[in-house]
């Protein structure tokens, strides 16, 4: 019996060492050497401090900023740990809302968001990504159309010409990955940083 167990145990130890130790360390080392910024989380620094990541969205609510997609992430309720409260872009709780297309709660949330956006920009169709959450709840990007939809509000709040803001959006559009994958997109954090830089000039 020991003769049968020995090869199995040797194989278990060898595969554990290779797949659990050697492979992860090799991949981490190669990623750190070839892509140091990405391996560290694609962090964005401003004035010597980290202000975010280009991979994780943030909750921008000010009138003078571009807003991202709605986020369905939540956190434990401080008053009652058995319940949760909304916590937009909570990276520790990445997930969609799990609300199906027949959910009354989802319909109410979308109706409320839609009404607010239509009041902000009457007569213009609302881009779908401004009322729908992503699968992760942490999407850092919006469509160019969603960014352009917000231009009039930001122009009013910052007293800037709309044409200048449209040019700003156009300069931040990232195309499809490898020309094939995904859709054109705008990173909301990067766009807001460029917007702040514009205001300083």
UniProtKB/Swiss-Prot annotation:
Alphabetical UniProt keywords: ATP-binding, Cell inner membrane, Cell membrane, Ion transport, Membrane, Nucleotide-binding, Potassium, Potassium transport, Transmembrane, Transmembrane helix, Transport
GO molecular function: ATP binding; P-type potassium transmembrane transporter activity
One cellular component (GO) term of this entry: plasma membrane
The keyword Protein transport appears for this protein: no
Pfam family of the protein (one): KdpC
Main location: membrane
Topology term for the membrane: Single-pass membrane protein
Transmembrane segments: 10-30
Entry's localization field: Cell inner membrane
Keyword Transmembrane helix: yes
Top-rank taxon: Bacteria
HAMAP family per the UniProt record, alphabetical: KdpC
Similarity remark: Belongs to the KdpC family.
Record's subunit section: The system is composed of three essential subunits: KdpA, KdpB and KdpC.
Name the UniProt record assigns to this protein: Potassium-transporting ATPase KdpC subunit
């Amino acid at each position: 019996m020991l003769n049968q167990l020995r090869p199995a145990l040797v194989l278990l130890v060898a595969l554990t060492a290779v797949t659990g130790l050697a492979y992860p360390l090799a991949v981490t080392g190669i990623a750190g050497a070839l892509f140091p910024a990405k391996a560290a989380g694609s962090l964005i620094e401003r004035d010597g401090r980290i202000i975010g990541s280009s991979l994780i969205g943030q909750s921008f609510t000010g009138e003078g900023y571009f807003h991202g997609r709605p986020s369905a992430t939540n956190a434990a309720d401080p008053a009652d740990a058995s319940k949760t409260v909304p916590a937009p872009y909570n990276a520790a709780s990445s997930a969609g809302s799990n609300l199906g297309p027949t959910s009354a709660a989802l319909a109410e949330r979308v109706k409320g968001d839609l009404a607010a956006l239509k009041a902000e920009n009457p007569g213009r169709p609302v881009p779908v990504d401004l009322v729908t959450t992503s699968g992760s709840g942490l999407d850092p990007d919006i469509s160019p159309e969603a960014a352009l939809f917000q231009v009039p509000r930001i122009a009013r709040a910052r007293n800037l010409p709309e044409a200048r803001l449209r040019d700003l959006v156009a300069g931040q559009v990232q195309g499809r990955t490898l020309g094939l994958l995904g859709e054109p997109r705008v990173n909301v954090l990067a766009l807001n940083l460029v917007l702040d830089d514009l205001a300083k000039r």
